[in-house]
Amino acid sequence: LAAVNRIDRIRLGLAAISRLRNQINETTALAVWSANGPVIVRWERPRRPITVDVVTGVSVELLNSASGLVFSAWLPERRTSALIQAELARQPADAPMQTMADVQQRLAEIREKGIVAIGEHYFAGGVQALGAPVFNFRNEITMVLVVVGIVGMSDLGEDSMAMHALREAAQALSRQLGSTQPDTQASRLNHIDAIPGG
């Protein structure tokens, strides 16, 4: 199967987060990998009075964001190690991940579940998020679909409708991109080139 070019890949991703927003009425976003880490390229606002605004075009950290944890779980270590080490050096004392061993354990859990939920230690206070990987025709991670909500107002638990919808949306998009195992957490580590500037 021929590779979907970058423009088509992003176009399909944007359509996916729009449909997902309409389905669950939560903030949704699309993240890609850049030389400096994950970058949100676009987000969709839900139809509710209080929402979470998402900054686009800026790299987010790996250990305290949904997109960062998902990319870290499926990218090869050589692509993420330096960024993770730098973040570990400035982790607060109460952060759950203090060593590379802690990180590896967390990433193994994410690969096992195939999805990530982050709340208490999300980089923005009072906000929780979900992230799911999107795989390409080589069964390598290429994007991350993200759902963001306000703690106490959004149900983003591990058995929530939002999580199930996110998982289904990521798998459907993976199939569109030619993945033959979109629902397999063992999809091999990615060797994609970074997208300059996001």
Residue ranges and their predicted role:
Residues 68, 72, 76, 167-174, ...:
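Short amphipathic alpha-helical signal-transduction/dimerization elements
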Residues 19, 36, 47-50, 78-91, ...:
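Hydrophobic/basic alpha-helical segments enriched in Actinobacteria
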